[in-house]
C-alpha cells in the first residue's frame, strides 16, 4: 500500500499538471482547418467617399466639379467641426451596420467579417480633427452580433497617424508619414491597446485575428522599420502578454513569399497570417485587360500562395473590372477606364465608357457572364490556401464593390460553392 506521503505527492502533481495551461501553440485558432469566407465592413468606422458618397455630397458647392468636397475622414471632420462631425458620424455608425446585417452575412454562407477601424478611435495627435472615443463601443457591439450569428472577426487597424499609404481609406489622403517619430509612437500605443484587448479570453472565441496595419505602402515606406513593427507586435503578444491570438500582417504590396523568412515556424513563431489584397483596376494596364487576361492573373495569384511559409488569406478583393465607380480613385480624380483620371502628373486615356457601369439592367448577357466568371475564378483561386474576405459588404450606389447587390443580382454564387464556370484555373495549378 502506498504511504500517505506518496499519495499526497501524487495528488499534488496531478493538481499541478491539471492547473497548467496548454502550450500556446496548441490553443490558437487553426486556420489550416478553416476556409475563411468573409466580407469587409468598409465605410463604417472608417469613412470612404466611394462607399457612402451621400455623407460627402452635402459639401458640394456646384454641379460641375468636386471643389469643396472633403476627400477623407480627416478633412470631413475638419470641415464640420467636432460637435457637428460627432453628431453626423454617430448617426452613420448606428445605422450603416446593424444586427440585421450580421444575420444577412451569416445567411449567405459567410463565416468571417473584417472590421476596419482607425487609430483615431483610440488616441489622437494634438492637432487631429477626428471624432474619437466612440467607435470602440460600436466595434464591441459588432463582435457581439458576430458571436450571436456564428461569425468570426478580424479587427483591422486601417489607418495610422500621418497615414501609412496616402489613400483616403487610411483617414488622410496624399501623405505617408506614419513612420515619423511622433506618429510612430502614437501608433504603437494604439496597436498595443488593440492587441491586448482583443487577445483576451472574452474575445478570442470570436476575434480570430488582429491585423497590425492595413496596406502599408511598401514601395514608399522603410520596409526594415515595418518588419521591426511586425516583430515588436509579435513579441508583445506572445512574450509580454503570453497570449495566443492570431497576428495578421499585410504584405505591404510586396511579391508573394516576401515574408517567408520572418516570424516563421522554423524560427519558433506561430499563429502569423499574411494578408494579401488583389485588385486589377488601379492602372491603365489592368483596366484594359480582357476577361481571360484578368482570370489568368487570378489563377497565378492562387498558385503563388501554395509556396508561402505562412497561412495566407486574400483579405480584400472585388468583382470590379473597371474603376468607373464614382470616387473610387478619390474625390475629384476621375476614372482611368473612360480617360477622366487626373492626379498630379498622372493622366489616363479612353478604354471604354463608364455609362451604365453600375446599372445591371443595362448589361448584356456576356457582361454578366464575365463578372460571374471573374468572381468564381477568384473564389476558387483564393481558397487554394486559407480563403478570402470580399471588399466590401455593402455600398450606397456601386455594384462592382457591393457583396449584397452582387448576390441579389445573381453574380455572386449562392451557395458560395455553386459554379456556372467551373475549373477556370485547372491548367494553372
UniProtKB/Swiss-Prot annotation:
Regions annotated as coiled coil: none
GO cellular component annotations of the record: cell surface; extracellular region
Propeptide: 20-27
Gene Ontology BP term (one): glucan catabolic process
Major localisation: secreted
Disulphide connectivity of cysteines: 299-425, 324-354
EC number, UniProt record: 3.2.1.58
Catalytic activity annotation: Successive hydrolysis of beta-D-glucose units from the non-reducing ends of (1->3)-beta-D-glucans, releasing alpha-glucose
Keywords linked to the UniProt accession: Cell wall biogenesis/degradation, Cleavage on pair of basic residues, Disulfide bond, Glycosidase, Hydrolase, Secreted, Signal, Zymogen
Superkingdom of the source species: Eukaryota
Biological role: Beta-glucanases participate in the metabolism of beta-glucan, the main structural component of the cell wall. It could also function biosynthetically as a transglycosylase.
Name of the molecule in the record: Glucan 1,3-beta-glucosidase
Lineage per the UniProt record: Eukaryota, Fungi, Dikarya, Ascomycota, Saccharomycotina
Amino acid at each position: 500500500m502506498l504511504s500517505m506521503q506518496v499519495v499526497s505527492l501524487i495528488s499534488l502533481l496531478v493538481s499541478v499538471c491539471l492547473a497548467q495551461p496548454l502550450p500556446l501553440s496548441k490553443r490558437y485558432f487553426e486556420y489550416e482547418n478553416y476556409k475563411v469566407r468573409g466580407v469587409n465592413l468598409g465605410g463604417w468606422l472608417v469613412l470612404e467617399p466611394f462607399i457612402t458618397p451621400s455623407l460627402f455630397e452635402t459639401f458640394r458647392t456646384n454641379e460641375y466639379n468636386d471643389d469643396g468636397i472633403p476627400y477623407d475622414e480627416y478633412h470631413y471632420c475638419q470641415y464640420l467641426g467636432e460637435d457637428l462631425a460627432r453628431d453626423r458620424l454617430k448617426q452613420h455608425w448606428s445605422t450603416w451596420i446593424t444586427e440585421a446585417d450580421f444575420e444577412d452575412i451569416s445567411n449567405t454562407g459567410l463565416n468571417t467579417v473584417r472590421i476596419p477601424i482607425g487609430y483615431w478611435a483610440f488616441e489622437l495627435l494634438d492637432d487631429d480633427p477626428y471624432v474619437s472615443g466612440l467607435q470602440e463601443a460600436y466595434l464591441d457591439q459588432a463582435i457581439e452580433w458576430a458571436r450571436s450569428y456564428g461569425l468570426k472577426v478580424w479587427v483591422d487597424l486601417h489607418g495610422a497617424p500621418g497615414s501609412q499609404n496616402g489613400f483616403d481609406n487610411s483617414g488622410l489622403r496624399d501623405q505617408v508619414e506614419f513612420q515619423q517619430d511622433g506618429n510612430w509612437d502614437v501608433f504603437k500605443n494604439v496597436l498595443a491597446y488593440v492587441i491586448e484587448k482583443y487577445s483576451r479570453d472574452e474575445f478570442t472565441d470570436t476575434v480570430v485575428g488582429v491585423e497590425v496595419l492595413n496596406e502599408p505602402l511598401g514601395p514608399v515606406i522603410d520596409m526594415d522599420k515595418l518588419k521591426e513593427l511586425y516583430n515588436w507586435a509579435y513579441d508583445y503578444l506572445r512574450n509580454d502578454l503570453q497570449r495566443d491570438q492570431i497576428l495578421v500582417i499585410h504584405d505591404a504590396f510586396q511579391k508573394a513569399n516576401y515574408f517567408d523568412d520572418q516570424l516563421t515556424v522554423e524560427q519558433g513563431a506561430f499563429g502569423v497570417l499574411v494578408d494579401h489584397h488583389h485588385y486589377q483596376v488601379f492602372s491603365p494596364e489592368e483596366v484594359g485587360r480582357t476577361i481571360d487576361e484578368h482570370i489568368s492573373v487570378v489563377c497565378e495569384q492562387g498558385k503563388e500562395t501554395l509556396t508561402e511559409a505562412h497561412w495566407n488569406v486574400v483579405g480584400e478583393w472585388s468583382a470590379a473590372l473597371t474603376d468607373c465607380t464614382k470616387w473610387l480613385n478619390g474625390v475629384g480624380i476621375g476614372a482611368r477606364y473612360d480617360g477622366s483620371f487626373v492626379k498630379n502628373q498622372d493622366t489616363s486615356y479612353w478604354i471604354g465608357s463608364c455609362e451604365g457601369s453600375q446599372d445591371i439592367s443595362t448589361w448584356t448577357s456576356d457582361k454578366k457572364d464575365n463578372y460571374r466568371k471573374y468572381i468564381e475564378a477568384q473564389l476558387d483561386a483564393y481558397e487554394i490556401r486559407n480563403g478570402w474576405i470580399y471588399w466590401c459588404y455593402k455600398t450606397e450606389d456601386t455594384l462592382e464593390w457591393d457583396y449584397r447587390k452582387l448576390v441579389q443580382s445573381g453574380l455572386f454564387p449562392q451557395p458560395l460553392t455553386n459554379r456556372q464556370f467551373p475549373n477556370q484555373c485547372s491548367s494553372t495549378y
